[in-house]
Each structure stands twice: as C-alpha cells, then as structure tokens.
C-alpha cells in the first residue's frame, strides 16, 4: 500500500477518535445541529476506521508469523506458520481492495432522497403499460429497502400503466442506489392485445435526480414562475376532480415545468412543487447546464428511442440485459418483483472500477 494512503487512513482514525470524544461533550450534546452533523461524520468514518485497524492487525499477524517461521525448526510448526502467513496475506489483499474502494471520491448526493420519473417512449399503449410495470418494480424495491415512495404526479395510459409518473423516494442512500437507473429501458414481449402472438418492442425513459438541499445559491424571482392549477387525475377518492388542487409551476427563463397532485391541499402541492422546481434548477446549475433544466433529463435518458437503450427486458426469454456492463440475468420474473440488488451492485462495482482507473491515471 502506498505510504500516502497509509497517512490519510491514519489521519482518518485520528479524526474518528476526535469525533467520538466530541460526541460526549455536553456542549455538543446540547447543540442539536452540531450533534447531528458530528453523528453523520462519525458514522461515515466508523467502517473505514474499523477496516483500517483490522488491516494493520493482519499485517502484524503476518510479520509475527514470518518471524516465528524463521526461528522454527520443527516441520509441523513451519507448516502451521506458513499457513498463517498465507491466510494473513489473503486477508490483507481483500482488505486493501476494500479500503481502496472506500477511499474513492464520494458523490455528496448519494445519501439524499431522489425524484424518480418514468415516461412512456416509443411503443404507444404498450410503452405506457410497461411504465406501470417499471413503477411497480421500483415500488417493490423501495418497500424491500424500507424506503418511502410518494407519487407526486401521474398521467395514466388509456389501456393501463402511465404515460408519465413522477415520484419522490426517501430513505437511506436512495440516490446512490438508483442513480444508474437513468436511461432508456426497452421491453420485448407479446402484448395482451396481440392476436398473432408477435413480439413487440417498446421503450420507456427513467430519470433519477437527487433532491438537493435548498440554499442561497438558487434565487428564484417569483415573477419568473408561472403558477397554474388543475384537477387531480389520480387516486384520491371522492375529492378527485372536484377541486383544482393539483399544481403546475413553470420557470419561464429555463422552461422547467413541474407538477404535483399528491395532496388534496393546493397549498401542500404548491410547496412540494416548489421544492421539486428548485431541486431541478439547482442540479442544472451544479452541472453547468444553464440552457434549461430539461437538458439534464435528455442527458440522463436520451430521447426515448429504442436504439438508445441501457437495458432490455425480454419476456419470452425471461431475460434482462444491461447493455452498459454486458450483464445478462435469466430471472426476469424476480427482477420485475423488485429483485434489483444484483443489477445495482454490478453497476456500482463498474462505476467504482472506473473511478479507480481515473484516480490511478491522474
């Protein structure tokens, strides 16, 4: 391991011990904001500190075993010491790989909630139906993770599914898990309306954007925001379509449009829509895409054309293929039931490998 990395890890251990002590300080305990901030830092440092201490311990074990091997004369003792050396060496290699991953640059948005948007692309009614299938897939995954998924806006398809559905997902590390889902998702299957049994191909777009904290870097002039109301079209019992409680906000300079019809209260919908609007505009600013907030969605998902797919769901073959990492799994039924960890873990490993390559080449 490089000496510079050892130094950084030792510094992190020192900081971990410092933060641990601060969390017992009465002045910190009485300051809710400071205590919360240090608790998050303590949690972030705990795993890497523990792993680094175990790594150092394994190095010590290896060195002790090597010293004993040199002194040993008994063949059985030599064999036992060599086994200990080999075991310690394997452990060190595994832990060094894990430490390298943990030291990679972190996306500050990985732990925040996310807006998940699904839109029907090419394929007409079948694309809308598949949008509904994707929504239920993510909904079940969110439930399995203990996350909360809220539907903010939904435009239902004529024969089921959704032409568009926008949700907010909150919980632990939501954006970090879902951010690789952005792109065109292609489906190949025989529609229920197909009498000849022919396989049809259609597509949906998925966009995942972090819910960034509102700060002073985004200042919206109220005169630049057009406020419209309309009647909710989704679930809501007897109150649906009786009042104009749904809200649409348009940021005129960028053309950014957001809608929210989750609540029966127009006031609550407006507050949520404003949060969505600021999040979108702030993310555009962070990525230096000042032309319009819609640019970020095009970068994330493409145009919705089947040729721009990131993933294909082939129902006749029970197959899912992620084209970015050449991963094919023959368990489509369980995937559509929300079994996404194998896919998401593989995408994360590929991302980490790319980061390590870029850091190594820097």
UniProtKB/Swiss-Prot annotation:
Methylated by PrmC. Methylation increases the termination efficiency of RF1. GO terms for cellular component: cytoplasm. Keywords: Cytoplasm, Methylation, Protein biosynthesis. It comes from the Bacteria. The modification N5-methylglutamine is found at residue 238. Its main location: cytoplasm. It is found in: Cytoplasm. Pfam families: PCRF, RF-1. GO terms for molecular function: translation release factor activity, codon specific. InterPro entries: PCRF, Pep_chain_release_fac_I, Pep_chain_release_fac_I_sf, Prokaryotic/Mito_RF, RF-1. Belongs to the prokaryotic/mitochondrial release factor family. Peptide chain release factor 1 directs the termination of translation in response to the peptide chain termination codons UAG and UAA. This is Peptide chain release factor 1. It comes from Psychrobacter arcticus (strain DSM 17307 / VKM B-2377 / 273-4).
């Amino acid at each position: 391991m490089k000496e510079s990395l050892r130094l950084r890890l030792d510094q992190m251990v020192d900081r971990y011990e410092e933060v641990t002590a601060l969390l017992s300080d009465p002045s910190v305990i009485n300051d809710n904001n400071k205590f919360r901030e240090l608790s998050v830092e303590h949690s972030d440092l705990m795993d890497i500190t523990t792993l680094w201490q175990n790594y150092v311990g394994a190095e010590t074990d290896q060195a002790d075993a090597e010293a004993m091997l040199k002194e040993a004369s008994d063949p059985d003792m030599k064999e036992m010491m060599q086994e200990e050396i080999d075991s310690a060496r394997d452990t060190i290699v595994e832990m060094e790989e894990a430490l390298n991953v943990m030291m990679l640059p972190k996306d500050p948005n990985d732990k925040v909630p996310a807006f998940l948007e699904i839109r029907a692309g090419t394929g007409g009614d079948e694309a809308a139906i598949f949008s509904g299938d994707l929504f239920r897939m993510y909904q079940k995954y969110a439930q399995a993770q203990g996350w909360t998924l809220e539907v903010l806006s939904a435009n239902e398809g004529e024969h089921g599914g959704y032409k568009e559905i926008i949700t907010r997902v909150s919980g632990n590390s939501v954006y970090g898990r879902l951010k690789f889902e952005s792109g065109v998702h292609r489906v190949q299957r025989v529609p229920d309306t197909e009498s000849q049994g022919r396989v049809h191909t259609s597509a949906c777009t998925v966009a995942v954007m972090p819910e960034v904290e509102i700060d002073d870097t985004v200042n919206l002039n109220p005169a630049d925001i057009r406020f419209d109301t309309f009647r909710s079209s989704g679930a809501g019992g007897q109150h649906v379509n009786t009042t104009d409680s749904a809200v649409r906000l348009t940021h005129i300079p960028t053309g950014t449009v957001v809608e929210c019809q989750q609540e029966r209260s127009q006031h609550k919908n407006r507050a949520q829509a404003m949060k969505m609007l600021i999040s979108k505009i702030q993310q555009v600013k962070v990525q230096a895409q000042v032309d319009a907030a819609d640019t970020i969605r095009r970068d994330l998902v493409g145009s919705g054309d089947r040729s721009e797919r990131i993933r294909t769901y082939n129902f006749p073959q029970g197959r899912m293929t992620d084209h970015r990492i050449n991963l094919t799994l023959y368990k489509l039924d369980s995937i559509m039931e929300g079994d996404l960890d194998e896919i998401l873990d593989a995408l994360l490993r590929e991302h980490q490998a790319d980061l390590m390559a870029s850091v190594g080449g820097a």
